[in-house]
């Protein structure tokens, strides 16, 4: 069994050694330009077209939860990967726990009005504020995949009203489910905190625009943990400046790194992190990949395969 590995920033030596230990029967090598030797599996992140084109592979693993970079290249270069080759994403590998930590900490930050108290501190004002009530702090999660379910599970224990919106209806205990475009408005109207965990597909690009934001409750909050292209940033600024949105926490942006001239940097009600909400944990990723490859080799059922048409 031959395995190709490519990642532009990871510690390649660590990964190759870990994969060799987890799959002792495999020959693992780093892909380099000009390598056209046969391989059975490819483990990649933002792979060059040349790496995959023309290969007869059993499967390709994206080294992250999203596969949009591969799918976008496939649109421009369909010869890069035959339709018959299964494409897998990392289902969790520790990212769910990280998303839970991020979402819970930010929701509680807003609920306890720490953003307001920081603003008062900046003005040297000692002013206790009325507390929010949980029943008035409904949380809506857009995207009901593995990460969405993890976030909902972690927030449920705090007693907030929870709702989710996705392509198909879910049956999560304690979470009100909305499905399809026809139910999006009803989902938004009672949402105070909007958490975006949607996949990156042609249908979801630009979905968080002024029309959508205006349907939220007044003084709403936005937490974007998915992709920057989901948010129309100019519309977000309008909603913040006219008071519809009280605050936004952004981990992802339409352009990364975020340009220095972006008004988001200096907006007083925007907080941000540099795309670190959930990162690949190498040891857990190797365990998932090796387990999946072993099951594929035995012809056993596996999870994590991407539907190329849906984009996730």
Swiss-Prot record:
Its EC number is 1.1.1.79, 1.1.1.81. It catalyses: glycolate + NADP(+) = glyoxylate + NADPH + H(+); (R)-glycerate + NAD(+) = 3-hydroxypyruvate + NADH + H(+); (R)-glycerate + NADP(+) = 3-hydroxypyruvate + NADPH + H(+). The keyword GTP-binding does not apply. It comes from the Bacteria. CDD domains: GDH_like_2. It is found in: Cytoplasm. Keywords: Cytoplasm, NAD, NADP, Oxidoreductase. The active site is at 227, 275 (proton donor). Pfam families: 2-Hacid_dh_C (PF02826). It is an enzyme of class 1 (oxidoreductase). Signal peptide: none annotated. The keyword NAD applies. Gene3D superfamilies: NAD(P)-binding Rossmann-like Domain. PROSITE patterns: D_2_HYDROXYACID_DH_3. One of its GO terms (cellular component) is cytosol. GO terms for molecular function: glyoxylate reductase (NADPH) activity; hydroxypyruvate reductase (NADH) activity; hydroxypyruvate reductase (NADPH) activity; NAD binding. Catalyzes the NADPH-dependent reduction of glyoxylate and hydroxypyruvate into glycolate and glycerate, respectively. Belongs to the D-isomer specific 2-hydroxyacid dehydrogenase family. GhrA subfamily. PANTHER family: 2-HACID_DH_C DOMAIN-CONTAINING PROTEIN, D-ISOMER SPECIFIC 2-HYDROXYACID DEHYDROGENASE NAD-BINDING DOMAIN-CONTAINING PROTEIN. This is Glyoxylate/hydroxypyruvate reductase A.
